[in-house]
């Protein structure tokens, strides 16, 4: 069979070495084995073309920072399996760039040729029976003028006298020399790490929190959560898969990743199982080596600082593993992180662990797991294991010191009131006192919460310093907004309150109550009025809840707590000559026969809140079937908790907007 000597000229997606490269661009799905065959020439129905690892697309701008070396990973792929070994030779090709400029009316200048080199002489082989060559590294050494944009083009040719296509296509990379980016800026002995769910959130938000004393970033490491490990059903090869949101971030690395790195924040990417057989704990040695090389291509091309592994959601087949897989074991996971260390150099390797088999242990080639990884974090949060996992590093891992372990992961999303649920300073004091070196945070919701109050509380324990917020917050796609920070004075005024839920009693045609049902979000009948109390430290709050005719006459007292409003059960009126009834605020929820039953035994609980970046206030309590309302007492007993005339009860949670 004839194989086209595809001279698909091309600048292939290049990689960044270490932390010093700026790259944007990847294919929409960022899957290495996906190509665009629409542009390809064929010879006898078989074609070959140059591709970049990590799915990087043509005309990707690559930034070379300081004296760092950028590294690209190129390979050659045929549309059908080779019948015999095919040798492919890549070369940097200025003629291709000139032709591209002429055809497209551009004037790209070639990057200095003496700063470019191809590993292994630019030679790679497609073995008989396979379609892809091994990858060849394209090294871009520092050179050129800072601020100027250059280009590089690469072409390829094949041996064995195969016919050359006359309709070549080119791949071109833009290269931008830039000043060096700073190394990590340490603020203390404890590294702060944050997993960001990029399906919804923007990692740039993590760079807006800084230490009060010197302006250093609060977060040391930000992890893109998450790309996936999957198996190609056709080839059986394990590869990286990125969904649209991760792909968008990688394609726009200069917009989302580089600004954090410029502040000294390391940006890593989490690899997560994805409901097929591919996992961290079942790769053969050969498969582990191959996958490690692919991960390195992602690090190089997108300028990432490391990889975190999270071995969840893999469908392990221990009874009959497919070729290339073995039975799941911690030893196999250890082999993977070992092979990653061999090719990653000083790049970060982290592990998110919460069970037993989902983490590496033991030693590989005489090297213990604790000496391979840079950090591990326990995976159960404050609502799942309030006491953390202190001491787990000794009982579960070979040679893992406390300095590399996070025993108290802290979830800071809306599920846990922005991180305030279960908050206890003494827990973080224990992290510090016992010599642990990692504090992990998970799933921030920066469009819902201002985190500087929470982070200050934690930072004052860990670092004896507070945290400031810039006031800026970012949408997922990169729109910047200016937020508003609220102090004690800012809560004074009129607020419109909207509940996330409400319940009403369905009444039949004969007037008989049948059942409670959801009525959805509702506004309070009257706006809430907040005034300062006499001491100037708390508030007097009017019109709260379902009965403003009572709470408007007898207001609550509330505290200023964690930057927001704290609401708690209390007596709002003691019976007197004018009104002998006593009114108390209790938590209550629905019951039968029009009852909204009070629970005085819950009087030790409270509702507290957090401030959104736009100045809205979110209030949370016992749950969305509960509310805090006034109950009338006569003779020391609740007179009634049956309210047939109330169309619905406004229940938690609440959003308050300043009028």
Language-model features: locations:
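C-terminal motif of bacterial Sec signal peptides marking the signal peptidase cleavage site
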Residues: 21-25
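Beta-sheet ligand-binding and adhesion/scaffold domains
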Residues: 483, 557-659
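Secreted glycan hydrolases and related glycan-binding modules that recognize and/or cleave
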Residues: 27-86, 92-115, 121, 125-487, ...
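Generic short beta-strand segments
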Residues: 157, 496-504, 543-546, 570-572, ...
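N-terminal helix-cap/turn-to-beta initiation motif at the start of protein domains
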Residues: 480-498, 534, 655-659
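N-terminal glycine/threonine-rich, aromatic-flanked beta-hairpin/loop signature
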Residues: 504-573
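Bacterial N-terminal signal peptides that target proteins for export
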Residues: 2-12
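Hydrophobic helical h-region of N-terminal Sec-dependent signal peptides
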Residues: 12, 16-20
């Amino acid at each position: 069979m004839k194989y086209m000597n595809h001279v698909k000229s091309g600048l292939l997606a290049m990689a960044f070495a270490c932390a010093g490269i700026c790259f944007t661009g990847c294919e929409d799905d960022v899957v290495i084995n996906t190509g665009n065959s629409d542009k390809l020439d064929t010879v006898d129905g078989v074609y070959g073309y140059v591709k970049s690892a990590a799915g990087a697309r043509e005309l990707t701008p690559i930034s070379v920072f300081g004296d760092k070396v950028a590294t690209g990973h190129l390979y050659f792929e045929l549309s059908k399996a080779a019948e015999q070994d095919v040798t492919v030779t890549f070369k940097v090709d200025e003629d291709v760039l000139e032709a591209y400029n002429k055809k497209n009316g551009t004037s790209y200048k070639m990057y200095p040729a003496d700063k470019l080199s191809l590993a292994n002489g630019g030679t790679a082989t497609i073995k008989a029976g396979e379609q892809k060559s091994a990858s060849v590294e394209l090294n871009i050494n520092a050179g050129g003028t800072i601020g100027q944009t250059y280009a590089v083009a690469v072409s390829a040719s094949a041996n064995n006298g195969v016919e050359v296509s006359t309709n070549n296509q080119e791949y071109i990379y833009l290269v931008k020399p830039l000043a060096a980016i700073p190394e990590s800026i340490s603020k203390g002995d404890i590294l702060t790490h944050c997993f960001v769910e990029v399906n919804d959130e923007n990692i740039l938000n993590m760079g807006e929190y800084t230490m009060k004393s010197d302006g250093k970033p609060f977060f040391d490491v930000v992890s893109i959560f998450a790309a996936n490990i999957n198996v190609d059903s056709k080839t059986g090869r394990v590869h990286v898969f990125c969904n649209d949101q991760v792909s968008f971030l990688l394609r726009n690395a200069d917009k989302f990743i580089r600004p954090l790195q410029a502040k000294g924040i390391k940006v890593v990417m989490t690899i997560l199982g994805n409901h097929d057989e591919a996992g961290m704990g079942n790769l053969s040695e050969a498969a582990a080596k191959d996958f490690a090389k692919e991960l390195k291509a992602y690090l190089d091309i997108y300028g990432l600082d490391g990889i975190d592994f999270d071995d969840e959601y893999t469908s392990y087949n221990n009874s009959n593993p497919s070729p290339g897989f073995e039975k799941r074991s911690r030893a196999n996971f250890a082999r993977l992180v070992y092979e990653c260390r061999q090719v990653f150099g000083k790049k970060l390797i982290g592990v998110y662990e919460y069970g037993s088999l989902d983490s590496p242990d033991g030693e590989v080639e005489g090297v213990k797991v604790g000496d391979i990884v840079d950090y591990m974090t326990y995976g159960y949060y404050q609502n799942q294991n309030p006491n953390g996992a202190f001491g787990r590093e000794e009982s579960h891992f070979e040679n893992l010191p406390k300095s590399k372990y996070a025993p108290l992961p802290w979830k800071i999303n809306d599920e846990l009131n922005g991180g305030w649920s279960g908050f206890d300073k003494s827990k973080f004091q224990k992290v510090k006192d016992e010599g642990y070196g990692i504090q992990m945070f998970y799933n921030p919701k920066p469009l819902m919460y201002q985190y500087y109050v929470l982070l200050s509380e934690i930072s004052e324990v860990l670092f004896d310093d507070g945290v400031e917020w810039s006031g800026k917050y970012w949408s997922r796609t990169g729109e910047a907004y200016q937020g508003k920070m609220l102090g004690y004075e800012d809560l004074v005024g009129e607020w419109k309150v909207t509940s996330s839920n409400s319940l009403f009693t369905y009444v039949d045609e004969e007037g008989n109550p049948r059942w409670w049902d959801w009525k959805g979000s509702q506004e309070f009948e009257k706006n809430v009025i907040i005034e300062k109390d006499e001491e100037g430290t708390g508030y007097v709050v009017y019109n709260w809840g379902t009965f403003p005719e009572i709470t408007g006459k007898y207001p609550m007292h509330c505290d200023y707590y964690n930057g927001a409003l704290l609401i708690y059960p209390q007596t709002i009126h003691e019976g007197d000559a004018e009104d002998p009834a006593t009114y108390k605020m209790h938590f209550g929820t629905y019951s039968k026969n029009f009852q909204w039953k009070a629970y005085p035994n819950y009087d030790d609980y409270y509702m507290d809140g957090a401030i959104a970046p736009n100045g809205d206030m979110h209030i949370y309590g016992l749950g969305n079937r509960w509310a805090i309302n006034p109950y009338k007492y006569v003779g020391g007993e609740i007179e009634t908790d049956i309210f047939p005339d109330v169309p619905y009860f406004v229940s938690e949670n609440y959003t308050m907007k300043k009028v």
